[in-house]
């Protein structure tokens, strides 16, 4: 699939901001209209072949970049894309907040059309303020598809559509307050035009609506960093162990060493308090208690009968049963196929729930058909019980390799003599189920390879997952989010309420945020590598499109010119110089709208010397006075210039300036001092190298 581009015809000022009406292609693409037979790219393009580096990747995978200076309209363009998809979904899907866990709100104020391609066919969504039309197909069969209720008549449209996963960690982005107009005199907001963003941050609708944005933001664009870190830690521990079982590194330079976990005695009280507050408008506190108790009672019967395990610690046993009941209720509140069994949408009195209804829900959860992301955490808890991890009152530390081996041995004991023994784990779910459930505090210790110096080999150091730097966390969080969602989307099964998506659109806004240049340089490669390790079933996920909004020349050097959208002052502009594998310095100056290739302080200092040199003949006395007053300073500036050519040029200029008032003897003395200084620097460098070799 490809996001071809957006045709912007107009909109409210606070929506389109500085973007001008026109065609905004996500590459060297033309607008696919009837007049050009819906052809949108030059024939024979091989750009996608660049990214087929691993066999398990989908058949089609494309990478595009959006580039421009601050204020050029990059984020606004993405917000237009989000608005169009949001409005399409809000018209297409039933908007029951009780069922989907999120309420999509139509976002008015935009006149634009989004063009995309899936399976070789062009589609588009026309959004003119509150009017939305969907088109798919070309020439004779290109007719608008009616968006109608109920979903059963609409979800066929989604079979050709794509699921968008967007990540943006900037604290100033996607703030609903930024869309509201303010009355200067009263200080009051005159509208709430940013509320449409709320629905896009919720992800618990079973991947029904075709978009999710991460990380989750509360009102005012606030990111709960503590919660995000905890969710990310669960994903990362799973991924590190998964790849370790395959003798691979999830991230180059990092391998899992130990897994540590400790029982959280306050889990039940803390979780129940928060959950009751979240669902207070839908369920009373007493109904929450009654429903959880009803589900927990049934789970206790199952555990006593099938697992034959009891726990000596009543707090641990109580927490396990609470967790199973609580997660069962959450599933009913979130997913319609479960909630309708007890009519949760109009639920009023838990005393009327029957034993048969409870049994039906729990059996549905335990069925093979529902062994997916919806029931994953319940299955994790059951797996924990099956494997007999019961002595959990004290903190436990286990070696990562031993943890994997122990669980593989446990699995293999149930295989027949004809079955091939497992030597590794293949999927995210398999490993996630092995980890302690959320009523444990968990952490992981990693081995990290560190380069001590240029002349020494890398050594291993131990570091806790929770102690990684912000840049390391950002890299890991970003990539783990993507893998987590791809895995979940692939597990969705078709029913009367859900249509699985076959195409995925990944968006990274300010992808290099917090990244060291080395992380920037390898970002696209690491992303593709990890996607390949998702073991994507090409029958389920047929294509992936990646859009990266970036200020990094390292990222841009991995993308060909034909796949780059340049923005300048709210307009699409064209560049002619190729980017793929280009020199980083050339990319910075040619493709990032930079006036100068160095910092402004450095430019001003050098400009002062160059200006002095240029006026040496017309104002000789002033030049000599400046040199006399600042001789040591100019020597210092010359000594710290890094670029060899620039350094030699400034050296030549200063020599000519000094010679204006020097006798031949003075000139020779100055040149001797310079030579002696150079020799001293060389001696110091030799001494340093000899010292390193001895160590």
Language-model regions: role of each:
Residues 2-5, 105-109, 115-460, 612-695:
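Coupling/switch/interface segments within P-loop NTPase motor domains and analogous charged loops
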Residues 14-26, 30-32, 37-52, 56, ...:
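Conserved small-residue
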Residues 522-667, 672, 677, 683:
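C-terminal lobe/lid and adjacent interdomain/linker elements of RecA-like ASCE P-loop ATPase modules
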Residues 98-101, 106, 492-503, 600-617, ...:
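Short alpha-helical "patches" and their helix-cap loops
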Residues 93, 99, 195-200, 550-551:
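Short alpha-helical segments and helix-capping/turn motifs at coil-helix boundaries
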Residues 6-86, 446-591:
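Switch/communication elements of ASCE P-loop NTPase nucleotide-binding domains
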Residues 171, 222, 474, 491, ...:
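Intrinsically disordered or highly flexible coil/loop and linker segments, enriched in small
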Residues 91-92, 224, 489-493, 534, ...:
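Short, flexible/disordered secondary-structure transition segments
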